[in-house]
């Protein structure tokens, strides 16, 4: 079973928010996964969809059958955290953490049933 993957890195969204979405598309066909993501109202859905389309393009480049592709796995890892400060009362400041994510989409050809 041949596999192909695509990675979107340094995305400005927290990994916890994206992980909630990806459980809904694992194991589905690419077409069903794209339809599911298209109708989700979250920012992360668009980012995962972009990574999924990139993986499909990589599969086309490897001359794989795009119609028979299945979403094998979607990994969401934490990227570097940007640290920002917000002024507060009495001359103090609080730290704001702006988290980033790395999304890896792994596709595989559907196993032929004998």
Curated annotation (Swiss-Prot):
One of its GO terms (biological process) is translation. This is Large ribosomal subunit protein uL22. InterPro entries: Ribosomal_uL22, Ribosomal_uL22_bac/chlpt-type, Ribosomal_uL22_bac/org-type, Ribosomal_uL22_CS, Ribosomal_uL22_sf. Part of the 50S ribosomal subunit. HAMAP family: Ribosomal_uL22_B. One of its GO terms (molecular function) is structural constituent of ribosome. It comes from the Bacteria. This protein binds specifically to 23S rRNA; its binding is stimulated by other ribosomal proteins, e.g. L4, L17, and L20. It is important during the early stages of 50S assembly. It makes multiple contacts with different domains of the 23S rRNA in the assembled 50S subunit and ribosome. The globular domain of the protein is located near the polypeptide exit tunnel on the outside of the subunit, while an extended beta-hairpin is found that lines the wall of the exit tunnel in the center of the 70S ribosome. PANTHER family: CHLOROPLAST 50S RIBOSOMAL PROTEIN L22-RELATED, LARGE RIBOSOMAL SUBUNIT PROTEIN UL22M. Keywords: Ribonucleoprotein, Ribosomal protein, RNA-binding, rRNA-binding. CDD domains: Ribosomal_L22. GO terms for cellular component: cytosolic large ribosomal subunit. Belongs to the universal ribosomal protein uL22 family.
